[in-house]
Amino acid sequence: DGATFEENAMIKATEIAKIANQMPEYKNAVVLADDSGLEIDYLNKEPGIYSARYMGEDTSYDIKNQTLLDRLEGVPDEKRTARFVCAIAAAMPDGSCEVVRGTMEGIIGHEIAGENGFGYDPIFFLPEYGCTSAELSPEKKNELSHRGEGLRKIRKILEHK
């Protein structure tokens, strides 16, 4: 395991690329991999790179979300800043690896809201839109999301290779 989203994405991409390069049909393939998660500033960027495993992999996101809300009980909005992070790595056929970071900034809301999305989306509040990530339309979420930003960045790099 790496210590950052970027390191984890690079490890995934380069390990898969090693396997792919042994198969003739994938010899010159570009391999993409990502590592994503939620950083909450007040909680020293927890859950961070452990977002999926926070409180154990078998713990439901309903419980994870409620636990985070409980930990932030009484914390004012200006100290509830958070971001979704997505690092995307592209392992190139020549052995090099490009990595980018996409982010979506917001705050942790005060309640679980919304049915769209998954994971921490129901507690991730976007003040400028007045709703959680789970309340956005799929189209709007793709436009604003950390993954969408990361994919747009890596695409720009790959188009110039």
Please report, for each region that a protein language model flagged, where it lies by residue.
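Anionic-ligand binding patches
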Residues: 1-161
